[in-house]
């Protein structure tokens, strides 16, 4: 069974945490992860881009001038796409871009993402957090520095803590998430994932053996 060091807020190792092989030790399925990201990003699209065609743009329906005798080029409508202010040809239309992924595949992708981070040495575990000592941004920043965490950091907590959420917003590259809301995309986009020990245990309990 895999094990990781548990650190306190000063960066000192205070114990070991066992990692479930079925959650953090599977072979990452990179094809599935790519599919998950494609579905996730597609579902983020609003699909509200819309232009007017010649049938929808306002303007006279009559012929702008006679077919012959004016010396001008032939035109049938000022709503034609070749006119300034006319309709748009082949422009974007409102569309539902949403895609779906079966529940089992979503779970498998999540476990693959966690295993990918674990195998790459990109997971760290924090024993506990004193909310009184992390009410300020500098306090939380000091903890990250003690743990030698830089870049895009995902900090996973077991429950909502408004003080940590507030102070975390002021730290560039830090994303604070709850274990119950954690998704595959958040894990993948992070350079390092920091779990509070209780949050890690909740994740393991939920996905163990699945």
Residue ranges, per PLM feature:
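Extended polybasic, low-complexity segments that bind anionic RNA or targeting/receptor surfaces
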Residues: 1-46, 91-210
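Glycine/serine-rich anion-binding loops at beta->alpha junctions
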Residues: 54-90
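Short, structured surface segments that line ligand/substrate-binding pockets
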Residues: 46-49, 55
């Amino acid at each position: 069974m895999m094990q990781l060091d548990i650190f306190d807020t000063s960066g000192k190792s205070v114990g070991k945490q066992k990692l479930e092989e079925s959650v953090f030790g599977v072979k990452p399925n990179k094809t599935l992860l790519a599919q998950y990201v494609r579905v996730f990003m597609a579902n983020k699209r609003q699909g509200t881009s819309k232009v007017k065609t010649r049938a929808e743009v306002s303007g006279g329906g009559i012929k702008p001038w006679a077919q012959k005798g004016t010396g001008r080029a032939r035109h049938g409508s000022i709503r034609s796409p070749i006119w300034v202010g006319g309709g748009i040809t082949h422009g974007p239309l409102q569309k539902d871009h949403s895609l779906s992924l079966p529940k089992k595949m979503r779970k498998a992708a999540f476990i693959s993402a966690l295993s990918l981070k674990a195998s790459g040495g990109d997971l760290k575990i924090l024993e506990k957090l004193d909310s009184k000592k992390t009410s300020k941004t500098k306090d939380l920043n000091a903890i990250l520095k003690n743990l030698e965490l830089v870049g895009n950091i995902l900090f996973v907590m077991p429950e909502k803590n408004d003080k940590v959420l507030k102070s975390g917003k002021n730290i560039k590259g830090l994303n604070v998430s709850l274990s119950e809301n954690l998704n595959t995309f958040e894990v993948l986009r992070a350079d390092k994932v920091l779990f509070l020990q209780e949050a890690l245990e909740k994740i393991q309990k939920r996905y163990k053996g699945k």
